[in-house]
Amino acid sequence: MARARLLFALSALVAASTTVAACSPSVSSSAPRDPFAAPIVPGQSARASAGSGGGHGTIDAPTPRSGSGTVTVALVGGAQLPTETAQEFTKATGFTVAVVPVDGVDAVAKAEADVVLGLDGADALQASAAGTVADAAPQDTTTLAGTAVDGAPAAVAYGRDDVCVIADKSWMSANNRPLPTSFADLSSPRVRALLAVPDPASSSVGRAFVQEAASQTGEGLGTFVQSLSPRVDATLGAAIGAWTAGDRVSDAYLSEVVGSASGASGAFPLVVAPRSLAAAAATNTGADSFGAPVSSTCIARIMYAAATTAPASDGAESLIAWLQGETAQRSLATTGAAYPIDGVLAADTKASWLMGITGEAVVADETMGSLDAMNAWLATWSSALAAPAPAPTTEPAPEPTTEQQASPAADPAQDEAGATGDDAADSDDEE
């Protein structure tokens, strides 16, 4: 009897196992063990999010030299060399890195650097003319087609990071302010007092903004600047600190920006900054940002590296060569430090999700041009800000009639909406 019970139990167990197997889907051995180990990107599967490698690079990058010692790197105008990227360089070559942030190219000489990162075309021309960078590119580097800077042969392209107006999307929406869709919108009554700008006289980022303003307004640059009511800060870091989403920017990013303060935020929802700021202000998912580059205000900028001496030190030459390689390009894209000049490596990274760059990575650097013209635009900016447009005047109103005297008058203070970020929010609450 006991034997019969045992046989019956075994038969039931086999039947149950067969039923479960028939109802259970098979799981591929290549499926990720934890499908939520990486943030899910809208429109992309969990598997792609967790396992995508971004493809292979297309640049025939040279092999960087190996060695020892420290390479001192000047980072211009918000350019980034994230810690994880620097560690990859050390692992590959043996050289270590020390970074010195500077706000503009005029400050590079004081940094006593071996190599400069983050130069745009105008910076490269200015640095070359001043003798701040070498007069030739290191021998173990590649100048990509379409990126050579006539007049600055030492400049070697490694990425792209346009300068734009970056909007705090949440603030603009909550306070019923329209996002600008053109440069002209920046001077509209409900927007013009919401902008923070790093000083173009000392900041490469601020200078690039003035160049784009001049390009879009032509001979009307002075009039346009007079119609603005911007906050002008001494450095890019100070401008980010005045941004309403400034406290959303990562400490890692701020540590490489002159004049920045961790956790600082202000009353200005629009700030002139590189596109990489949007990647640095990413939400917890990593797939969205508190900041949105306003594409109609952007000026295209290629990021260049240049050695400060010729011949370049072994460490400087090694870093410049390494930055063009697949590991470095992918690291820059993954961290959102820059859009890689090897555009295929941007796939499924912060750079592609948040920087707002579409199409080819290599484009004409729109900052390049006559240094004399640039100086003239900067002079126009300064003089226009010093003499803002006069307040509009109206003809004297006729004497009110008896009926008009009995009616309440409109408050003229309501004619101009929002002189500052805080005032703008208050006026909306009253509405």
Label each residue range with its predicted role.
Residues 62-64, 112-119, 133-166, 184-185, ...:
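A structural signal for short loop-to-beta-strand junctions that line the ligand-binding cleft
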Residues 202-205, 211-297:
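Ligand-binding pocket segment of bilobal, Venus flytrap-like solute-binding proteins
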Residues 23-46, 314, 322-431:
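Extracellular/periplasmic juxtamembrane helices and adjacent flexible linkers that interface
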Residues 166-172, 300-315, 322-323, 331-337:
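A bilobed periplasmic-binding-protein/Venus flytrap-type ligand-binding module shared by bacterial periplasmic
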Residues 23-27, 31-126:
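Early extracytoplasmic/lumenal segment of secretory-pathway proteins
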Residues 121-130, 151-178, 208-216, 300-306:
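Periplasmic solute-binding protein
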Residues 184-216:
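Short loop->beta-strand "edge-of-pocket" segments that line small-molecule binding or catalytic clefts
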Residues 133-143, 154-157, 184, 269-270, ...:
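Short beta-strand->loop
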